[in-house]
């Protein structure tokens, strides 16, 4: 939080005398020195003067002006520069009165490497590796689905480079027809593999018809050469591709590369639904719920979304040549178009009121936006009802933030603690945390709980992040340990959270939970109580978050090769074994005699290796 400013009222008249008519960006601060609004202007003096008129339009603007204690101005050469600077400031300060796009995920791509035998894989983040990138896709699930389809259509390798480099025999993917096994010589010619890579590239570019035409030609050539087995392979590929074509809606303009942005607004909340269309096909879609002041205008919401969404080049986002909008951007349209064109290095068009197939796309985006918004509002009402009931049940004035802790381990191994956070909109996942617990006796849940609470609350906390309730998934013992750890920290806080233990019933069935207070008082809520449902929700979230972290830790241990624990096997011998056998799976199936055939491996060492692999 910034240093507090002088609380006397802002002298707008004196300030405006110093403001220029040039383009630029302004930052407005409140009494404690926090940036509460960032804006841009073609004419700074004209724009800033509009805030301090006698009759200010809009409830949001009036509330903003009441809180202004200071304004900083940055002059820019052009309006385009101002738009980019405004975007950077909004990302930096996350001002209260700005519309904020809550989207912190980078978009995934399908990556085709430029190796001798290229590999298909999923990619996120900056494009540092040499190769070709296809996308972006709306989420990792869409990429995995596409890669799974690609394995069936064009069986080029998807294995890690380390696996590929150490194989001497084809893997299971080859056996089931999902890979051509370029790792093993003589199974496929260089030309045939290159052809399949070319087909995959064309398919990812949306050029299905070109791929089918080439495959038909190859099938006919194979038939004429009496190579009927190869002709049948090409025929199967053609049929599979045609089945895929039938499942996709394709516009008549097969070269369409565009994003379609639908928007819906209701009860102070907005939903923006984006359809990503590449080569005339719907690549995917996604709904966004920007954080916004309750009375923000639709034009402002959409303008802020477009700016923040497409200027976020760090997310690897591609700006298509055409962006279809469900609402006009008004005065901002020209500068946004110019800015996006400058960034993309080509002409970008923002279009409203489209016709034909584009109108169908927009209607689809608008329908999806309204559907997602209706669902979100319904969920929000349910959450609000549950918070209200819990507040009444616990006799609290307000509940704005709750945190819940749980511990997960297997027989004391790889202990992981979780902390999940709920606010009045439900799970606040960006504040979820996991803690790997170390330095305790395995299985000591009390010590684990003490450690996680000390790590969570032992450092200075922002006042707004101090919870109103801390739930501990456990009984009296866990709650008592938690209180002893947290009490010294709570004494320094401006408010005192309520500590509650959630003890499961004897049968451990949902609905039979007992709530335990630090005073020793216990009580239960009816099984149909909305307050109990909220407690179960946060408890289950914490439990699942801990378990998934624990499983990830266990999986890391299991990935460690059993060979690493065999005395006398260093990196070189380990690599020789894997290369000779064609991987760990094949090595595990080998007999003692077969292992002893590996150069540098004696019979005695082969015996040790065999025993370690069979019983490890």
Swiss-Prot record:
Gene3D superfamilies xref list: 5' to 3' exonuclease, C-terminal subdomain (1.10.150.20), GIY-YIG endonuclease (3.40.1440.10), UVR domain (4.10.860.10), UvrC, RNAse H endonuclease domain (3.30.420.340)
Gene Ontology MF, one: DNA binding
Major localization listed first in the record, in broad terms: cytoplasm
Cited PANTHER family: UVRABC SYSTEM PROTEIN C (PTHR30562:SF1), UVRC/OXIDOREDUCTASE (PTHR30562)
GO cellular component: cytoplasm; excinuclease repair complex
GO BP, sorted A to Z: nucleotide-excision repair; SOS response
NCBIfam families per the UniProt record, alphabetical: PRK00558.1-5 (NF001824), uvrC (TIGR00194)
Subunit structure: Interacts with UvrB in an incision complex.
Protein role: The UvrABC repair system catalyzes the recognition and processing of DNA lesions. UvrC both incises the 5' and 3' sides of the lesion. The N-terminal half is responsible for the 3' incision and the C-terminal half is responsible for the 5' incision.
Transmembrane segments: none
Origin species: Photobacterium profundum (strain SS9)
Family as reported in the entry's similarity comment: Belongs to the UvrC family.
InterPro entries: GIY-YIG_endonuc, GIY-YIG_endonuc_sf, GIY-YIG_UvrC_Cho, Hlx-hairpin-Hlx_DNA-bd_motif, RuvA_2-like, UVR_dom, UVR_dom_sf, UvrABC_protein_C
Protein name (record): UvrABC system protein C
Coiled coil segments of this chain: none
Keywords per UniProt: Cytoplasm, DNA damage, DNA excision, DNA repair, Excision nuclease, SOS response
Species lineage: Bacteria, Pseudomonadati, Pseudomonadota, Gammaproteobacteria, Vibrionales
Domain (GIY-YIG) ranges: 21-99
Matches recorded under Pfam families: GIY-YIG, HHH_5, UVR, UvrC_RNaseH, UvrC_RNaseH_dom
Occurrences of domain UVR (ranges): 209-244
